[in-house]
């Protein structure tokens, strides 16, 4: 069972509506997950029959059989008009940090738990996806964060995050000390288990669990949520998305720390380091079925009460 690694573009079949925005579609999913593999196989067959060129992310391509065009995420971003991520929000976040570098629309099929970012049902995606491919969809742009670690004035590490950048102890949970500055203005010193700097997208994730407010996706704002602060009056604070957040780690911290980006990428932090978190120039272009309602999603996922009358 070999994989066809030929990435040449076949001619579009006549069944494609040539006025559509999408011609080349990428499939991405969680490797070695039976439910995800089943959905990916159905998607690949369904899209191929309709004449779309389908590229499959190489980590899952070998599990889908033969006659698969396997490529990496960077090539999906560069070549595809639409990327379909099958999995949960974690899979979406991992793909989004790469795909945000490109002008590619991203839509999700939910094979996870809550699925705030994955709209399509795994067992009945065809009807909704067909409408999207025919041009009936809403587009939403979500901005990313850029996190940088400086040591003695030199950049040591950096990465991006869709949800949040979190300063926290490296291995064992314990109190750490640091100062927080907003646009170089001192805000406070903090003794806590860490600090979450979240986008509106991430406000329904780790930040929400830590007591932060939900920010609607269209807000140009960041929320800073201290983790178990030792001052009861310390509360989450919302700042402008154009703000630069600086956290200076006390030299007295005896343990090495980390900055986590979406819980996937970890940047090493030493006592005395400075962490800069700011809005990235990259944006994720999310595709939703027409009529997508954010408050309906919140109500459904969080179990909020339905209309009374």
From Swiss-Prot:
It comes from Shewanella sp. (strain ANA-3). HAMAP family: NAD_kinase (MF_00361). Involved in the regulation of the intracellular balance of NAD and NADP, and is a key enzyme in the biosynthesis of NADP. Catalyzes specifically the phosphorylation on 2'-hydroxyl of the adenosine moiety of NAD to yield NADP. Belongs to the NAD kinase family. GO terms for biological process: NAD metabolic process; NADP biosynthetic process. Transmembrane segments: none annotated. It is found in: Cytoplasm. It is an enzyme of class 2 (transferase). It comes from the Bacteria. This is NAD kinase. NAD(+) binds at residues 89-90, 163-164, 174, 191, 193, 204-209. The gene is nadK. One of its GO terms (cellular component) is cytoplasm. InterPro entries: ATP-NAD_kinase_N (IPR017438), ATP-NAD_kinase_PpnK-typ_C (IPR017437), NAD/diacylglycerol_kinase_sf (IPR016064), NADK (IPR002504). One of its GO terms (molecular function) is NAD binding.
